Curated annotation (Swiss-Prot):
The keyword Nucleus applies. It holds the Pfam family Nro1. This is Enhancer of translation termination 1. The gene is ETT1. One of its GO terms (biological process) is regulation of translation.
Amino acid sequence: MAKRTLGLAKAAKAKKQKKEQEHQESSASPDEESSSSNQLTIELPEEIDANDEISQLKGLHKTYLQSERDNELLVNGIIHECDRLLRENDSENKQPLPAVFHAIYAIALAELSKFHTEELDKVKEFFIAALERVESGLEKNPNDINLLVAKTKILLDQISLQYIAPLTLESDVKELDKEIDELLDAALSVYESVEARAKELKDYSIFDDSETLDILEALDDILDIVDNFGKENQGDDGSDEDDEEDDDEEEKSVELAETHPLYKIKNSDKYDQWWRDHTHLYLDNLEKLENGSPELKREVCHRLGQSYLQESEVPYSVFTKLKYDDEYDGIEELEGLTEKEAQKISQELITKALDYLKQAKDEEDPETWVSIAEAMISLGNLYEVDSKEQEDLYLEAEKILKRANNVTNGKFQEELDNLLP
């Protein structure tokens, strides 16, 4: 890595000074933060052209994305650099700034909202500024795919931080200026235009980028928040003393009123299905690239595998209760499923999950091996006790767990002990 200063940095600072500035940032005023950002020194990849300011800006943006994303000073640095480039461009009548400039600028403005989540007025201001910037970029670069990605990200973050975060169980849809499901539909429509534009250009490189994949993760996070909204044990201290009780509590949630802003999303499978359909399409688009990232492909396959496992949980539970639990003797159906129906559905879903988990396997990451073994064990549990199908799955899972346990010095001994008689 080569350390270079950007236009926003007038002189290089020693590492110790940089750390002190970052430490002081947390208590600095906005003006002080702006001043401090002018002292920022960042390590950028060696391939970044030191004479190309847009290339440097992209490197700074990438540095933030690859970090813990918890440094407001760095975000302010990106914004100050964008401001400087914009002023220079206006005063010197240079060539128009490229679309990627507007995308980075807009994302940085929206990112500031994450450091001020308790100040709703500020959050709104940041998103207004971010969306104005992305629209300004789209006026100059209609249908630019990077700007469409940026717009989708910003809209999803806005839904989470500006619209969902302030809600309580007593919230009413009448209190909002827009319905959240309509906002979500609008954001996803922009993402669909990303897919359509890539297809039109026959260029799928936009999907070989974790920043684009972040969109699907952001949607998944929103759906998770909605799904768990109102859980009775939210805010537990996390003690292990009553784990079994806590697990039961986690399943109990408060029913949302039909007038609640999240009611429509929580009581619909529409968005979960959208997530899966477009994650499949994401994988298809990745596979169209000759040199697509293997790491990204594994990540997408892992997410798909986990989604099928999650979907299998209800029928799996129904099958095991009706098959083995004495409390359910004489009961023919649970959750609208018979024992045989639940067994068949579970087997199909876990088989699909296994297919994707195998594609997600990383020889350098034993955790991915164990995910495969655990899915095999779950699938084995759905067959008759001591059947050939069950024995074959258990044996294969045992081999995988032993290998993972050996290379990790016993990390997965508990999983092995649970499997072995």
